[in-house]
Amino acid sequence: MTMQQALTSLTDGPELPALIAGAGDRTAWRFVEFFTVNIRNANTRAAYGRAAGDFLRWCEGRGITDLRAIQPVHVAAYIEELQGTRSAPTVKQHLACIRMLFDWLVTGQVMPSNPAHSVRGPRHSVSKGK
């Protein structure tokens, strides 16, 4: 499978987020691999694809032009902003996606460290009825 085929099956289109595309072919391939190798469930893959895309577009909208320039403060600000409009489980899912994606990029040696590692998510507990 070529990167283009993998990307098209992942995103329903041939476009990578600009921060990923601008970081070079190796980073782009690791990004596609993250979704195709790590996530087997199609629904989870789609949700994580949206979450990663939303975060990367959010970064671009704040003037971040280099993937390696993303810092924990950026991830924390994004999560805090999401908490104003999304449910706690959705926010936790976005943070889980961002953490896993950056872990994958660190493992592939395209990122020096994971900027989401130290960011805490919202508290959420499910209570059962009696």
Features from the language model and the residues they span:
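Short alpha-helical hairpin
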Residues: 19-33
